[in-house]
Amino acid sequence: MLRKRFKRVMCITSVLMMVVGSLGGCGGQKETAGGTTAPVEEAAAEAVNFPLADNYKFSIMTRVASDSEQDFSKKALVQRMEEATNVTAEYKAIPEEQFDDKYKLSLSKSDMPDVVTKMYIKPYDILGYAKKGVFIPLEGYIETNMPNLKKVLDARPEVRASITAADGHIYTLPFVNEWSTNSKENINVIGAIPYINVTWLDQLGLSMPTTTDELKIVLEAFAKEIKVENGTVVPMSFRINQVNQDPGISLGAFGCGDNMDHYMVTNDKKVYYTLAQEDARKGLEWLHELYAEGLVDPEIFSQDGATYSAKVASGRVGLFYDWAIGLAGDYTDQYEALPPLAGPDGTINIPRQNYYSFDMGVTAVTSACEKPSVVCAYLDQYFEPSMSIQNCYGTYDDPNYTNVFTQEGDMLKWTEEGAADGKIRNDQNLYDCFAILSDYYGVYVDRMLDSDALRLEMVSTIYSPSITSDFNYPAAFMEQKDITRISEIETDLKKYAEQVKAEIVKDGITDDAWKTYLDKLDQMGIEELITLKQKGFDLFYELTNYENAGQGTTAAEK
């Protein structure tokens, strides 16, 4: 069955690929004076028809989890792709904890791999490798050799904009994993969700709190009335300034709230910094009030992830913040998501995180690659809808591993084991080149992964209606000089702002101290920082008509 799908995909690919020119000159770096390298000029792409008459091999470096299959040649997807294309992808799988160091080292050598994937790098590094002639431009190959990816980029202009450098070139291939075309409903529009112990609420005869004042009353009751056998009750816990465990979502009851990089956008498209806003101060002072009364865990400033997880899983925390309710372990059934709270003046707002349904810097083809057209055409097979799902999660009819899916006609259906166990998925998947759009569910695969579907329902029904901002800060691909300047300012400024954020929760802040803090932000360059971030937002908006990004056509309509 998979062979039939492969043949159908290959046939479509061959028909769509038009000859643009010869392959000559498409490999190798360009030497400049002094022995340095310069960007590789874009080469003409060449039509490719699979299966090739003669076998072609290319090398690809990737990362792998320590508990999953290390030998990618044993994976059914890799074997089936070779059979269908007559292209051998020679994977060099590097353990997760060593990958970042090893791929950087490999890209500094003359015998670098043809492809490096699962890098997850940002524009500054992408442009750095491009200027050295390590990464080659890919937009010509996308147009000629990658019809599946092109279809996705045409349907999602925000993804195309995010991978297009200021010089007009595309140097890396993304992955896309989308759960909704409504950006306010995607599962990553917010990060940490507050989960409250409803068993304790029922035990005390209390209703779900709807305001910040009511939450304080509930936390006081937890502290005074609840007894546990395995330690002391912790009414409220989180990890300040830590991804997906920070309480910034609850600060929206006082205005803008907070997110992990502290950039937000007003509905008239103005970028601002949350930790320089008066209403963010009010929210932090509310947390200080709770902290001063002993209602907030004193370890919020210092506990690591393992300590926090163990504490929540012990069942003695009344309210905790995390991406997933499952952090509560055996006590998960006792918790529910805390709905958006109204602040003292009635404000209800859920702040957006600047998370995206794609990653811009996943896969690059290097100047060592002798036949980029063949390699890009090969990688494009994984951007076909059904293949994308298998690349991301795993496959079916594999006699050597527990299967993630079965297949009925063109529909993939989750197995019980595949849906439940990430290791089973990692043994079969590649998780590098894929694009899963929200309209694929129910067409190419029977349903979402259960945990994603649960979070999507939670976000879309409980939190999305209270998201007041129409924009998050996008994945803007800015000029290298602007990226450099942002980094220069942001490194110290963000560290200082987050330090003061934690200090306010612990000790509160006076008007004079707040003014001193704002003056220090000015001295550190916050005005220039926001100007540069605004420039990036405006550029992205111009490229994508961002107001409608991701909400129009489907890939199938292109």
Where are these regions (language model features)?
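Conserved small-residue motifs centered on glycine
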Residues: P385-G508, Q551
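Extracytoplasmic/periplasmic substrate-binding proteins
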Residues: L127-G128, N241-V265, H288-V443
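Conserved N-terminal structural module of periplasmic/extracytoplasmic solute-binding proteins
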Residues: R8-C11, C26-I217, D261-Y263, Y272-Y273, ...
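Helix-loop-helix "hinge/cap" segment bordering the ligand-binding cleft or interdomain interface
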Residues: E139, H169-I170, P174-Q245, V265-K311, ...
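Bacterial Sec-dependent N-terminal signal peptides
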Residues: M1-T13
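Short, high-confidence coil segments that cap the C-terminus of an alpha-helix
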Residues: D111-P113, G231, R316-V317
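C-terminal motif of bacterial Sec signal peptides marking the signal peptidase cleavage site
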Residues: G21-G25
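Extracytoplasmic/periplasmic ligand-capture domains
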Residues: K4, K75-Y91, L105, P194, ...
